């Protein structure tokens, strides 16, 4: 813990002093790219992806051998405001479904040969109702970020971040409103199917929460503490840990992007090692990506969460790395290069 003894101080210091890009590795990849048996630039974003991998792994021939999907699950006190068609018990039930191999993310991980870890975060103890109190105290929030940092402990070279938590699109909308302004209508969407009166209550909850905590919302970590959730704090911690260990990150949908947005608001360079796997059909997600200047890899109309969009994007990243490392050069293949 820092000398001041405040739990967030260590994270503030970490966010200020993150390791930077390896420009030498990036340059080496770009130099090799022009020698490969294809017209320059013809693989489009795949060429940018492999340069990104090199930049943040420090490897001049980047490979993806141990991709991991980390799914964080949390419950939220704000669900007491009747904002969602599903009860909070569904969060734990879905964690059991993940363990049994019965969820969409399980099938995508099988299809793409990805590892999967699921972290349930005190599901029996929901965070505080953000319309009435802070979601967490500073110690709990910092401890949960630290827990999220352990997601990479088993080893990975590409981390896909996802989540599960009934009510957490409400939380993500509140975070986005606090960080980037606008109105609740700009950020609130249907989530798991909130329409009609449910949607009106969801909008009201976001407005009330941001108004209640307004005095604390100038500090992004305080936004996380007051308005966030355990799974969002853990995802923020995992993103930071990955940066320290030179592990590129693929971020999933709206809720996972809200975790990244907290770090972005604290230091825009803090998520340079992150790629955003897809843009969700949840309306606020496209706006959130635009605020952070990020272009998603996929747009499939998905809005499930669970890391599904990130996991699908991981296969594209794997393919980009294999194209770069496995393709022959013009000289090796005896193919004439362009004049």
Curated annotation (Swiss-Prot):
It is an enzyme of class 2 (transferase). One of its GO terms (biological process) is cobalamin biosynthetic process. The active site is at residue 306. CDD domains: DMB-PRT_CobT. Its EC number is 2.4.2.21. Pfam families: DBI_PRT (PF02277). Transmembrane segments: none annotated. Keywords: Cobalamin biosynthesis, Glycosyltransferase, Transferase. It catalyses: 5,6-dimethylbenzimidazole + nicotinate beta-D-ribonucleotide = alpha-ribazole 5'-phosphate + nicotinate + H(+). GO terms for molecular function: nicotinate-nucleotide-dimethylbenzimidazole phosphoribosyltransferase activity. SUPFAM superfamilies: Nicotinate mononucleotide:5,6-dimethylbenzimidazole phosphoribosyltransferase (CobT). Pathway: Nucleoside biosynthesis; alpha-ribazole biosynthesis; alpha-ribazole from 5,6-dimethylbenzimidazole: step 1/2. Catalyzes the synthesis of alpha-ribazole-5'-phosphate from nicotinate mononucleotide (NAMN) and 5,6-dimethylbenzimidazole (DMB). Belongs to the CobT family. This is Nicotinate-nucleotide--dimethylbenzimidazole phosphoribosyltransferase.
